[in-house]
Each structure stands twice: as structure tokens, then as C-alpha cells.
Regions:
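Conserved lysine of the Walker
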Residues: 102
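Hydrophobic anchor at the beta1->P-loop junction of P-loop NTPases
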Residues: 92-94
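Flexible phosphate/Mg2+-sensing switch loops adjacent to catalytic phosphate-binding sites
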Residues: 81-85, 114-153
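A conserved segment at the C-terminal end of the G1
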Residues: 105-115
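Long, basic/Gly/Ser/Thr-rich N-terminal segments
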Residues: 1-87
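Walker A (P-loop) phosphate-binding loop of P-loop NTPases
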Residues: 99
């Protein structure tokens, strides 16, 4: 079975549909009501989809006879990339409380995977559809990297139904003693507003998204923890604004809500969960000199397990210090496999609406993903 990364339906390989290539001599475009219902808004005008008895790499349209290689999900009619169908990989979901910096994190993480981290891991990051390419360029890369503007807060899917996830395939070549194999991880990045997790209008799609995930990354804004705010210096405190009274900004509320959505039986959940404190740069001046969060990760093409454990314990201690130790205890009670992280997408406290004068200097943004690659046996772990 393949999980559609758009509607999250489980689809047997022999039920994958094809879409006519259209064009000269092909079928005329017509309204695709199924895709329209999935995306919301006006149904797009596209050549028709059709099913075949034994799907292969290509299929002939029964109406016009033209060959096509465009695969489509039978449930929502979204295009399924050939590479994704051949090697679908694990699905990683991203969830964050309101104001936790999800959009900025997505922009910087993808940029690092395409460049510095991708080169270190000998990994390729492939967008799975044209909408992903266009959305990343227009909504993430251009404003942040091209214009150095801060990204706007995520709109709730209730008011922004046309928002599709960004879908990428991260592929690594794993060289074993006997053979070489390609392993893939599917990053399905819904830039999910915190309130979406309690809205009846969209909860079904988000529920399928979360339950289809093989791992979840939670982004937590530590500046929403009163104990952490007390440690801010004057500049960081002035730029951070006040505490948000909205319950969707409370990290524990969001983690609890997701946990209850996922729970289908008693006992701890087995899905690996990475919980990352974003904007850690604002708090670094208050950390002890020997803190693991003062260290940058040393690039090695592997996961440094000693460093990983040191950062986890440091974040756990900080949560206790900030009177938020309940977060760590809740995770321990409800998940069999979880890890804590501290990161910063920008690397410094930004100006009111723009990146700081020092530019974008990401700090440990890749750490949660490296840990998940290690958990999925796609990355070696080393000590010493």
C-alpha cells in the first residue's frame, strides 16, 4: 500500500490511476470535481483521470489513446510523482503551536537540506509536485532569502482551504557491506495553524495527516513559557512581545491535543516524536557556559549520540528550570520514543518585520530530522 501524501488515503498499487496528458490529439480539459472538493475552491480544469487493470510506468488513455506517465490518487486525484510511487518512504509530519515559527522553520530546513546538510549526508531533496516548487519559491524562499522579510503567520485552513502541503522526497544512498540501497523519507509539511487542530471543519484531514505520519516533529516556542521569558535580556524581551493569552499558543495544549487525536488504544503511543524548542537563540545568553546548546553540531554524515543525549538532557533541565517540566513528564508518559531539541531557524533575534543585520544563520535546524533518520536506520549513530 502507498499513502497519498495529499489526502493520506491508503492506496493499493494496482488501484493507482493515471491522468491523460491532454494537449494536441489528446483529451480536452474538463472540471475535476474530485480534486476541487479536496483542495477547496473552483475545480481545476484538467484532462480526465482513468484506471487501468495493471498499472505500470505508463498507460494509454482509453478515450484518446495517448500514452501518459502522470499518476493520480484514486481518492483525491492529486498527482503522485513516479519516484514517490516507486519508493514512498516514511512520512514525517510537522505540528506547532501558534507563533512557534513553523513557516520560518520550514523555509530554512528545506534550504539547508538542499544545500549544506544535503551535501553532508549525500542526500537529494526532490519536490513531488509543481505546486510544491511554486509555493516554496513564492511563499518561503523569495520573501525570506531574497527579500529578508519575516514570513507571515500561518492562516488557519478554515480560511485558507487552497493550501496544499509541501511534499518532498529525501533520498539517501546507504552503502552496506553486501549491497547499496536507496532509502527515502517523505517530508509532508502542512504549515498547520494551531487552531486547525480543534476546528471541526478541517479536523478530518488533519487527523488523517497525523495518523498517516511515521514520525511527528513538534515545534514549541519557549518564549510562551513564563519561566523562559524571565531569562530574556532587554532587546530580546522587547522584540518578543507579550505572552499570548490564546490557548493555541500553549505548547502543552497543542501536544495534548495531537496526542488525543492519535490515541486509538490505551498505553503509550509508539510513533517517534521530536519536540524542538524554536528561537533558542534568544535564550542562549542566559544559559550556563558549559551548556550543550552553546555548541554547534559538528558535521560528520552521522548522528553524534553523545551530543544528542547531552542536548536532550539540557532541554529537559531547562523545562524544569522554567517551571514547564510537565512537558517532559507528559511526553515520557504518553510516547515510547521521544527526543528534545533546541534550535533556531534565523540564528538571532530578528527586527520587527525583517531578518537581523547578521543575516540567516541557522542553528541545529536539522537535528530533529537527523534523529529521525537514525531511528529509521537511514543514518549511522556514532560515539566519541
Amino acid at each position: 500500500l502507498i499513502t497519498c501524501p495529499y489526502c493520506f488515503a491508503r492506496v493499493a498499487e494496482n488501484r493507482i490511476m493515471f491522468r491523460c496528458s491532454g494537449g494536441r490529439g489528446g483529451c480536452e480539459a474538463r472540471a475535476d470535481e474530485v480534486l476541487g472538493r479536496h483542495r477547496g475552491g473552483v475545480p481545476p480544469s484538467l484532462p480526465p483521470v482513468f484506471s487501468v487493470r495493471r498499472p505500470g510506468r505508463r498507460a494509454s488513455c482509453p478515450e484518446c489513446g495517448r500514452e501518459t506517465s502522470r499518476r493520480a490518487c484514486p481518492q483525491c486525484h492529486s498527482r503522485l510523482a513516479a519516484e514517490y510511487c516507486a519508493n514512498p518512504g516514511k512520512i514525517v509530519a510537522l505540528v506547532g503551536a501558534k507563533g512557534s515559527g513553523k513557516s520560518t522553520y520550514i523555509a530554512v530546513l528545506l534550504h539547508e537540506l538542499m544545500n549544506r546538510v544535503g551535501a553532508e549526508l549525500d542526500a537529494s531533496l526532490t519536490p513531488c509536485d509543481d505546486r510544491t516548487i511554486e509555493r516554496y519559491r513564492q511563499e518561503f524562499a523569495r520573501p525570506l532569502y531574497g527579500e529578508h522579510r519575516l514570513l507571515r503567520a500561518t492562516q488557519s485552513a478554515v480560511t485558507d482551504r487552497g493550501r496544499d502541503p509541501l511534499v518532498y522526497l529525501l533520498t539517501r544512498t546507504i552503502r552496506g557491506r553486501l549491497r547499496t540501497r536507496a532509502e527515502s523519507l517523505t517530508l509532508v509539511l502542512f504549515d498547520t495553524a494551531g487552531e486547525d487542530l480543534r476546528s471541526r471543519d478541517v479536523s478530518e484531514l488533519h487527523l488523517r495527516y497525523l495518523r498517516a505520519a511515521d514520525a511527528i516533529v513538534f515545534l514549541v516556542d519557549p518564549l510562551e513559557l513564563p519561566g523562559a521569558r524571565a531569562a530574556l535580556n532587554g532587546t530580546a524581551l522587547a522584540r518578543s512581545g507579550g505572552l499570548d493569552d490564546d490557548p493555541d499558543s500553549d505548547p502543552l495544549n497543542v501536544i495534548t491535543r495531537v496526542t488525543e487525536l492519535l490515541r486509538q488504544s490505551r498505553g503509550p503511543l509508539t510513533v517517534p516524536v521530536a519536540v524542538a524548542l524554536s528561537k533558542i537563540d534568544a535564550l542562549r545568553p542566559s544559559l550556563a557556559r558549559q551548556s550543550a546548546l552553546h555548541r554547534a553540531r559538528v558535521p560528520s554524515g552521522a548522528l553524534d549520540l553523545d551530543d544528542r543525549e547531552a542536548v536532550h538532557e539540557q532541554v529537559l533541565a531547562l523545562l524544569e528550570e522554567w517551571q514547564a517540566g510537565v512537558v517532559g513528564r507528559y511526553l515520557r508518559q504518553n510516547y515510547t520514543d521521544h527526543a528534545l531539541f533546541g534550535l533556531s531557524a534565523l540564528g538571532a533575534v530578528p527586527e520587527v518585520e525583517s531578518v537581523g543585520a547578521g543575516g540567516i544563520r541557522p542553528y541545529r535546524v536539522e537535528d530533529p530530522l537527523l534523529w529521525l533518520l537514525y531511528r529509521f536506520k537511514m543514518l549511522d549513530g556514532v560515539r566519541g
